[in-house]
């Protein structure tokens, strides 16, 4: 193999590799000798088919395989010989006029990782803003839960049902006098004014009393989930078995038991733990941003454009998805377009910090164990259809690049935790509002034109309580796609395992493609589609 360097500018490298026709032909001959003993052909004893016939039968296929393997091996040898550290998958091209019997000229272009010296971590100083959880906060949360879990008691038989009252009803629905599937229910609870049943249903039950029977007529929405009912007029025979009125909920052991807890103390313990988890997430976000800011301030080395492009694309795609869900998508899209350069700066910052964290981790022996990687892979596999999970796990095992991308966020967290342990940390007690304001203030500081804009942190999402805890106030934050809390160390890309024989590229073979993620589940039809929206 002949090697010629054609580009050496900054982090960009390019080479021309020449595989002589003689080399290629010799490898094809070796492949023929290897497979000849297994070839069967009428008129010849097993294993005795002449090499020239084997080559005639399978030569084209062997040639393609030899070219693929030769390109792969040549690129691997180049990277090893030149001691290159590819930032991303090298771009590999085979000359378009190549044909069997001629030299193969392969163009290889790539960006390399910059040389980054791991900084000293001896003088790191961090402030940890802590938020204590008071008994009052715990009870406020429980009271919100109680407000969301309303209780009802039987009303007097003379009471006429009004908005906010709960009805216990039996109903039977029909279209043109014929009952339809799902149009019948017994002891169905319905809170008037809740809007849970199709338009017109609840309104016609206002004023009914316990024991009343009534036939109501409604029209199903044109976009109703059951196509056989969409847009059709239906009649419902309704029997009101009980009118109930809302009553105050007593917060006691019985209330906790209704929520699946042993007693009220256990409920308080659960809520306190969740509130602490929320605030601990915010504390970590603020502390991590302070750490990253310190690291970013002292380092401004060049980063590979390809890595920045890939990071920016990820940020941009998420921002566009979020904008599309806003009340005014066009306005939201214009807003992010106006800040496009800022988001690219965020992407560059992420890549730079990622490379820096990676070097710090390697210099200090931070590693991800095989057990941790296995658990990470199994967790990631859960987002795929059950039949695709095994294939996804095999894909991760076989593709170093995919494994590196999956490993990166966990590795970052381990490096950050390592730095937290090494830093001199002082605690300061603040309110939740002060902590959120501190995070937002850092974001506002980054908006100044003189500074590169970075991503503000996003509040950690609390786990949902079994008791349907009311959501806490959201921390003032910018788009999730650009939060510093998601800084990811750059995954070091592996060279392509195989290069296609024609116009080689970095695309993976089809069998190694990651399985498609399972689609979002379609909303299941309600058990009683006749009466529900």
UniProtKB/Swiss-Prot annotation:
Its recorded name reads Trigger factor
Question: Is the keyword Cell cycle assigned to this protein?
Answer: yes
Keywords in alphabetical order, please: Cell cycle, Cell division, Chaperone, Cytoplasm, Isomerase, Rotamase
Reported EC number(s) for this entry are 5.2.1.8
Q: Where is the composition biased (Basic and acidic residues)?
A: 481-490
Question: Residue ranges of region Disordered?
Answer: 436-533
Q: What does this protein do?
A: Involved in protein export. Acts as a chaperone by maintaining the newly synthesized protein in an open conformation. Functions as a peptidyl-prolyl cis-trans isomerase.
Enumerate the spans annotated as PPIase FKBP-type domain. 164-249
User: What does the record give under GO molecular function?
Assistant: peptidyl-prolyl cis-trans isomerase activity; protein folding chaperone; ribosome binding
Q: Which Pfam families match?
A: FKBP_C, Trigger_C, Trigger_N
Query: What gene does this protein come from?
Result: tig
| Keyword Aminoacyl-tRNA synthetase attributed | no
The protein's matches in HAMAP family, at most eight in alphabetical order, are given as: Trigger_factor_Tig
Which PANTHER family does this one have?
A: TRIGGER FACTOR CHAPERONE AND PEPTIDYL-PROLYL CIS/TRANS ISOMERASE, TRIGGER FACTOR-LIKE PROTEIN TIG, CHLOROPLASTIC
Q: Name one GO biological process term.
A: 'de novo' cotranslational protein folding
About its domains, the entry says: Consists of 3 domains; the N-terminus binds the ribosome, the middle domain has PPIase activity, while the C-terminus has intrinsic chaperone activity on its own.
Catalyzed reactions per annotation: [protein]-peptidylproline (omega=180) = [protein]-peptidylproline (omega=0)
Per UniProt, the ranges with Basic residues bias are 465-477, 494-506, 515-533
């Amino acid at each position: 193999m002949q090697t010629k360097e054609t580009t050496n500018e900054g982090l960009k490298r390019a080479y021309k590799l020449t595989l002589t026709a003689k080399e290629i032909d010799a490898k094809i001959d070796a492949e023929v000798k290897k497979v000849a003993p297994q070839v069967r052909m009428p008129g010849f004893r097993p294993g005795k088919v002449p090499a020239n016939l084997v080559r005639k039968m399978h030569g084209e296929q062997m040639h393609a395989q030899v070219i693929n393997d030769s390109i792969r091996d040549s690129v691997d040898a180049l990277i090893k010989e030149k001691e290159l550290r590819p930032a991303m998958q090298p771009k590999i091209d085979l000359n378009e006029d190549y044909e069997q019997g001629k030299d193969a000229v392969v163009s290889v272009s790539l960006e390399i990782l910059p040389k980054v010296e791991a900084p000293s971590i001896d003088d790191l100083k961090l402030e940890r803003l802590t938020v204590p959880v008071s008994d009052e906060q715990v009870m406020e949360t429980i009271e919100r839960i109680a407000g969301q879990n309303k209780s009802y008691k039987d009303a007097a038989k003379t009471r006429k049902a009004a908005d906010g009252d709960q009805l216990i009803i039996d109903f039977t629905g029909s279209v043109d006098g014929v009952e339809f599937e799902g149009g019948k229910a017994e002891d169905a609870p319905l809170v008037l004014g809740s809007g849970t049943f199709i338009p017109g249903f609840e309104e016609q039950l206002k004023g009914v009393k316990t024991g009343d029977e009534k036939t109501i007529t409604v029209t199903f929405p044109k976009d109703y989930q059951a196509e056989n009912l969409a847009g059709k007029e239906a009649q419902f025979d309704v029997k009101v078995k009980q009118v109930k009125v809302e009553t105050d909920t007593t917060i006691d052991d019985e209330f906790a038991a209704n929520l699946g807890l042993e007693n009220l103390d256990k409920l308080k313990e659960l809520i306190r733990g969740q509130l602490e988890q929320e605030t601990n997430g915010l504390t970590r976000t603020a502390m991590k941003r302070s750490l990253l800011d310190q690291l970013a301030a002292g380092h401004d080395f060049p980063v590979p454009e390809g890595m920045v492009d890939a990071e920016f694309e990820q940020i941009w795609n998420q921002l566009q998805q979020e904008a599309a869900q806003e009340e005014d998508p066009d306005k939201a899209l214009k807003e992010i377009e106006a800040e496009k350069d800022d988001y690219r700066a965020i992407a560059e910052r992420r890549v730079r910090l990622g490379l820096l964290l990676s070097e710090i981790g390697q210099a200090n022996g931070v590693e991800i164990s095989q057990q941790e990687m296995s658990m990470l892979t199994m967790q990631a596999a859960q987002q795929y259809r059950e039949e695709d999970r095994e294939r996804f796990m095999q894909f991760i095992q076989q593709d170093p690049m995919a494994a590196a991308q999956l490993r990166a966020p966990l590795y970052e967290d381990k490096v950050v935790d390592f730095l937290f342990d090494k830093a001199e940390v002082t605690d300061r007690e603040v309110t939740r509002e002060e902590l959120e304001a501190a995070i937002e203030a850092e974001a506002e500081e980054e908006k100044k034109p003189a500074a590169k804009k970075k991503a503000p942190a996003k509040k950690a999402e609390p786990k949902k309580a079994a008791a349907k805890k009311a959501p806490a106030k959201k921390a003032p934050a910018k788009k999730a796609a650009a939060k510093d809390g998601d800084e990811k160390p750059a995954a070091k890309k592996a060279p392509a395992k195989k290069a296609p024989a024609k116009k080689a590229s970095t695309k993976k073979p089809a069998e190694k493609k990651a399985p498609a993620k399972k689609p979002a589940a379609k909303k299941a039809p309600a058990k009683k589609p006749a009466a529900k929206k």
